[in-house]
Every structure is written in C-alpha cells, then in structure tokens.
C-alpha cells in the first residue's frame, strides 16, 4: 500500500488549482489591443453624447450619475484611469475626451460650478475631433 502516490495528486491539485485559476483570471483581464482604443472611445462617446444632449435639454442630472458609472466601466476595461495600460499614452486626445465629456456636459447645466473652466468645452471639442480623425485612420 503506497499512500504517498495517492496523496501526491491531491496535494499537487491543491497547489496547482489556485495557480491555474490565477492564470485564467489574468488572461480574462488581458489588455485590449491599444490600436483599437480610438475606435472604441468614439463608439462609446457616439452612444453617450446624444444621450447627454437629451439630458441637458431636459436638465436631467440623473443621467450624469448613471453615465459616470458607464464611463468608469469603459475606462477600467481599457485600463487608462488606473494607468494599467501605458500603450494608451499615445492617445491622450481620446482618453481626455472620454474623461472630460461628463464635466463638459454638467457645465452646460451648472454654469457656476468651479470645475467649469472657460476653455474646457473648446479643449473637449478639439480632443473629440482629433480622436475621431485618429479612429478613422486606424
């Protein structure tokens, strides 16, 4: 009766199983191809900007709270808010457009807010146009 042989696979399984789960999880969190980011940013903004315009017209501040969650989810999926994806540094116009669109929209409702800088809307529009042009090229 050789008990060491029957125990080895079980103990090995207890060691290997968590490692395999960690590898699988890291694969699920693998970064997306950075070259696709401008198109993804424009797709995200293409859905959000019309909804934001409707919210501004209706003075619906609830939109902004929900949109903030969607923006954070998008940012997290690409790793640019946490600096997990340094490859996105080549696309500051796109990361800034995604980061700033809600502030620009809120400033159209709450014009006296301290975060509402005079040039913010112009910078956002410039970043949006540059990101759109880049997305069309890539």
PLM features per residue range, with description:
Residues 12-20:
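Sec-dependent signal peptide hydrophobic core
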Residues 75-114:
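Long, amphipathic, charge-rich alpha-helical segments that form helical bundles/coiled-coils
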Residues 100, 113, 122, 137-138:
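Secreted/processed peptides and extracellular or luminal domains of membrane proteins
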């Amino acid at each position: 009766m050789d008990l060491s042989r029957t125990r080895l696979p079980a103990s090995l399984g207890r060691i290997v199983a968590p490692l395999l789960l960690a590898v699988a999880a890291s694969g699920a969190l693998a970064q997306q191809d950075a070259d696709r980011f401008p198109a993804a940013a424009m797709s995200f903004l293409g859905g959000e900007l019309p909804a934001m315009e409707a919210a501004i017209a209706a003075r619906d501040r609830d939109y902004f709270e929900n949109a903030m969650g969607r923006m954070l989810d998008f940012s997290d999926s690409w790793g640019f808010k946490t600096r997990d994806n340094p490859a996105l540094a080549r696309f500051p116009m796109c990361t800034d457009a995604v980061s700033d669109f809600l502030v620009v929209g809120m400033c159209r409702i709450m014009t006296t807010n301290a975060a509402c800088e005079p040039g913010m809307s112009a910078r956002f529009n410039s970043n949006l146009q540059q990101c759109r042009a880049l997305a069309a090229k890539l």
